[in-house]
Curated annotation (Swiss-Prot):
Residues 389-466, 548-615 are annotated as: Disordered. The gene is NADK2. Expressed in leaves. Optimum pH is 7.9 at 25 degrees Celsius. Residues 390-399, 413-429 have a biased composition (Basic and acidic residues). Residues 335-380 are annotated as: Calmodulin-binding. Residues 1-62 form a transit peptide. It is found in: Plastid, Chloroplast. It comes from the Eukaryota. This is NAD kinase 2, chloroplastic. GO terms for biological process: NAD metabolic process; NADP biosynthetic process. Its main location: plastid. GO terms for cellular component: chloroplast. Its EC number is 2.7.1.23.
């Protein structure tokens, strides 16, 4: 029935009485091996490559005789029924033989994972340790702690599970009731609780190893595949399967879903299988699906699960056309939305995409919800349109001249208004025919009834997020009513916007005046020249035989101006005669002027309005976020300005169609402490130099400023031998991952090399750095050491001064080395000055392909190429002919080194560029790469370096300000533009 390699069973053999054989009631088998062969019931071991299992049959006989009663009904155990009403996530009930099998599958998979890990760590035969230590030293202990803790937890759970399965839990078997099952762990059967704990451990181990196991390493692949198999058997509920189904280590909760919903058709075994459902797909699972002819995989997971092995195999399969993947993201424990169910139904109904496999993480919650909603969608009732006579159609069309059909067809009303039409008419309909017409369907169309479902009942009761916005509150206060917005939404108050189709204009009066409906309403409220008051209860005003023009109505000089009352329900009230009067034009004109003046006065708040309310008005003053105000012309096209940095995107409406800058892209940055800093890292030049200056600075910081002083371990050894400096602390140089969390700012004593060392010391965020010039050049060190007390006080107490402390955020470059298209572990560097790829000692010119966002831009043939930051522009790049760039400019410099082509000039790229320097396969020789002049290593053919802006800059404290310090360094260190003055004539 099952195999078990659990070592805990071996010492039990000596304590059990032998038996003559296995009961005939247990003589059946189910294929559980990975190669598809049927394995007989019993335990199997291998000794010297010779299988033996007769002695272990005695163990099973003795255990089953003690743990289980003879009337368990093992003869009736068969493959799990296809009835999905049996709560598949619970698993088999306690005492079932399927429960024992599920336990042993987990034991066996865990044993294999443990063996693969131990063999990878250290070969038991040769004693060779084969673990690559390419990752950084500070990450090594964290990884070891995670793996050891997770393995210890798994071992503890396995021992507990073995004891439970071997002791034969008769009490839990008798007390368990399926009706009492809930989500809480205390009400779940023991197997479900055990699987839940094992799942958490496996997922923790997955997260710990996902960044360190790469597909190009065979040993990593073995460990990863064993881990995924253990996860699958933990995800699986534990029911037995048919012989032709994949084993539980490949897919959890594998189950076919049939097209028919009736139990008689399903049990007939002739029913068509619509698709298969189950748990996550792994590398081996994908291989099985392809070999068995599956064409489509539907992934219901909304979360991101990092599995490089599976993703690599999936990309290859997709590129070869072997499989198609459809993403329908659904959150955990949530039901799919209506549009997602419709999309899924369309995929299932397409016979060219079958066979189909649908999966989530475990194949239980989201897949069950999708199957249920899919069946509900497929069995929904179909309604047909009620036939309407031609006469009634003409009557309705004449009554609603510009009804929803014309609007939906796109004649003058935008899509946003179309959505409102369908929503309003859908609520306001009274018959099937009017509903089909008002929702935008053309005559003669027949469709299924709207398929609507609430994916989350709680969220469906939550009002929209903008219900209390300025726009919505203004609409509500102006409406002076409490009725739903779908029935009594007031017309738009701003000229130039297309009114909602609920308020249609169907009348035309003589004349060439442009009349606004709000003006007519005000006239109706105040009365005409004869003193006749128009009714104010009408919710919309229709002008007979009128036509749209930019959201306004062109009126003509008919003797009687008819104003009809349209209630929005397809029926129009009798027109109201309005005698000719000059008050109409005067009222409209005066109202337009008053409204224009009001909008000019409130132009400051116009940016808070939505796009619909920001329409162009002839003769009106408009404003935008650019700060430029001018008169908008109706003939001028509107535009949007979209700003994106490759990560985020913002949209700014430019209503006056004029682009302008309101402020420079970079400004001066000032350092302000929310709380007083307490810890400082004191760095100095290597060797015994500058020890006196370091002692002086440390004493000042500790005794006068009451700060904790940290130094590097080598410097701490020197301080430890000096009396009176026991307050100096240190850190472990091998673990600097959390150093930035302990240090408030850094004080550097030396030259530019100390600042580069500080940049290399912090892998992520870097605290503010104040540097004192005690080196040979000191381009980046703008503070003289003579003023160190004053400068340090300004940094520590910068909040209490009026001028504050200015800092410069110096951009760094993140560099990653790739080999054969795969990232090399531990080969990630943050560069402050430059990265250099050169030919090294090779006699041939280097050939380097340069890509920007995966596009080949050029090929460098020369001694090499430099990619520098603005800070490094005054170093190696300047010597190679590059420009000198202010450190505040967000860019990167691309400078060739002695190029073979004289037309190859240096260029400056934006900081959003993503470069890749690749050594092509046809290059004559390899190349070398160095980062800030250190960590030099060889690049073979096919290797590449990817370069992009680092998230964390290096903040340096200025002596005066950014520009002043930079020009002083140019003059002091590089003698920039130093020459004799020209004599006067």
């Amino acid at each position: 029935m099952f195999l078990c390699f659990c070592p805990c069973h071996v010492p039990i053999m000596s304590r059990l009485s032998p038996a003559t054989g296995i009961s005939s009631r247990l003589r059946f088998s189910i294929g559980l091996s990975s190669d598809g062969r049927l394995i007989p019931f019993g335990f199997r071991f291998r000794r010297n490559d010779v299988p033996f299992k007769r002695r272990l049959r005695f163990v099973i006989r003795a255990q089953l005789s003690e743990a289980f009663s003879p009337d368990l009904g093992l003869d009736s155990q068969a493959v799990k029924s296809r009835d999905t009403s049996n709560l598949p996530w619970i698993g088999p009930v306690p005492g079932d033989i399927a429960e024992v099998e599920a336990y042993c599958r987990i034991f066996r998979s865990a044993e294999r994972l443990h063996g693969a890990l131990m063999e990878t760590l250290c070969n038991p035969v040769t004693g060779e340790c084969r673990v690559p230590y390419d990752f950084s030293p500070e990450e090594k202990p964290l990884l070891e702690d995670k793996i050891v803790s997770v393995l210890g937890c798994i071992l503890s759970l396995l021992n507990k599970g073995r004891k439970e399965i071997l002791s034969g839990r008769s009490s839990s078997m008798n007390s368990f009731n399926l009706d009492d099952v809930g989500v809480a762990e205390e009400s779940l059967p023991p197997l479900a609780v055990f699987r839940g704990e094992m799942k958490r451990c496996c997922e923790s181990l997955h997260i710990a190893l996902e960044n360190y196991l790469t597909p190009d390493d065979e040993r990593s692949g073995i460990v990863w595949r064993k881990l995924q198999k253990l996860k699958n058997v933990c995800y699986d509920a534990g029911f037995p399967r048919s012989d032709n189904y994949p084993c539980q280590t490949l897919f959890a909760n594998w189950d076919p879903i049939y097209s028919s919903n009736t139990k008689e058709d399903i049990d007939s075994y002739e029913s068509e299988i619509a698709f298969w459902r189950g748990g996550q797909v792994t590398q081996e699972g994908l291989k099985w699906l392809i070999e068995n002819g599956f064409k489509t995989i539907v992934d219901l997971r909304a979360e991101i699960v990092k599995d490089t092995f599976y993703q690599t195999a999936l990309d290859d399969a997709i590129s070869l056309g072997k499989i198609t993947v459809v993403q329908i993201p659904i959150d955990v424990r949530m039901a799919p939305k209506a549009e997602q169910v419709e999309l899924f139904a369309s995929i299932v109904s397409d016979s060219s995409k079958r066979p189909i496999y649908v999966h989530s993480k475990e194949g239980v919650w989201r897949t069950s919800a999708m199957v249920s909603r899919w069946k509900q969608y497929m069995t929904r009732p179909i309604t047909k349109e009620i036939p309407v006579s031609e006469e009634s159609k003409r009557r309705e069309v004449s009554e609603t001249k510009l009804g929803s059909n014309a609007v939906v067809s796109g004649k003058g009303v935008p899509d946003e208004q179309t959505d409102k039409v369908s929503e309003i008419n859908e609520v306001d309909s009274r018959s099937a025919s009017s509903q089909s017409k008002e929702s935008g369907r053309f005559e003669g169309d027949t469709s299924a009834s709207e398929f609507n479902m609430v994916s989350d009942p709680l969220k469906s009761q939550v009002p929209p997020g903008n219900i209390f916005s300025r726009k919505e509150m203004s609409k509500f206060l102006k409406s002076k009513s409490i009725a739903p917005a779908g029935y009594l939404t007031n017309p738009s108050k701003i000229l130039g916007t297309v009114p909602t189709p609920q308020f249609s204009y169907t009348g035309v009066t003589n004349g060439n005046q442009i009349v606004d409906k709000d003006s007519i309403r005000r006239l109706a409220e105040t009365g005409n020249s004869n003193g006749t008051l128009l009714p104010t209860s009408s919710q919309s005003l229709d002008f007979g035989n009128g036509k749209f023009s930019n959201g306004n109505v062109h009126a003509s000089d008919n003797t009687n101006k008819s104003i009809s009352d349209n209630r929005g329900n397809g029926f129009s009230a009798a027109p109201i005669a309005v005698p000719p009067s000059d008050n109409l034009s005067r009222a409209v004109g005066s109202h337009s002027v008053r409204e224009s003046q009001t909008q000019r006065n409130n132009s400051g708040s116009s940016s808070d309005s939505s796009d619909d309310e920001a329409g162009a008005i002839e003769g009106n003053m408009c404003a935008s976020a650019t700060g430029v105000v001018r008169v908008q012309s109706r003939k001028k096209a509107e535009m949007f300005l979209v700003r994106t940095d490759g990560v985020s995107c913002t949209r700014e409406k430019v209503t006056e169609s004029s682009l302008a800058f309101t402020h420079p892209s970079t400004q001066q940055q000032m350092l302000l402490w929310k709380t007083t800093p307490k810890t400082v890292l004191l760095l100095k030049k290597l060797g015994q130099e500058l020890m006196e200056e370091a002692k002086e600075a440390a004493s000042f910081l500790y005794h006068q400023e009451n700060m904790n002083v940290l130094v590097e371990p080598e410097v701490h050894d020197v301080f430890a031998r000096i009396p009176g400096f026991g307050f100096v602390q240190t850190f472990y140089i091998q673990d600097t991952s959390d150093l930035h969390e302990r240090v408030d700012f850094v004080a550097c004593l030396g030259g530019d090399g100390v600042i580069l060392h500080a940049s290399n010391l912090f892998k992520g965020a870097v605290p503010p750095v104040v540097s004192f010039n005690l080196g040979s050049l000191g381009f980046l060190t703008s503070h003289p050491f003579e003023d160190f007390r004053q400068d340090l006080k300004r940094v520590i107490h910068g909040n209490n001064t009026l001028d504050g402390v200015y800092i410069t955020l110096r951009m760094r470059l993140r560099c990653e080395i790739y080999r054969k298209g795969k990232a090399m572990p531990g080969k990630v560097f943050d560069v402050l000055n430059e990265i250099v790829v050169d030919r090294g000692s090779n006699p041939y010119l280097s050939k380097i392909e340069c890509y920007e966002h995966d596009r080949l831009i050029t090929k460098v043939q020369g001694d090499g190429v430099i990619v520098a930051t603005p800070t490094g522009s005054t170093a190696y790049s300047t010597a190679a002919g590059g420009s000198m760039v202010h450190p505040n400019v967000p860019c990167m410099l691309f400078t060739p080194i002695c190029p073979h082509s004289l037309s190859f000039r240096p260029v400056i790229l934006p900081d959003s560029a993503k470069l890749e320097l690749k050594i092509p396969d046809d290059a004559r020789s390899n190349a070398w790469v160095s980062f800030d002049g250190k960590r030099r290593q060889q690049l073979s053919r096919g290797d590449s370096v990817r370069i992009y802006m680092s998230q964390h800059p290096l903040p340096t404290v200025n002596k005066s300000d950014q520009t002043g310090d930079w020009f002083r360094s140019l003059i002091r260190c590089l003698n920039w533009n130093e020459r004799l003055d020209q004599k006067a004539l």
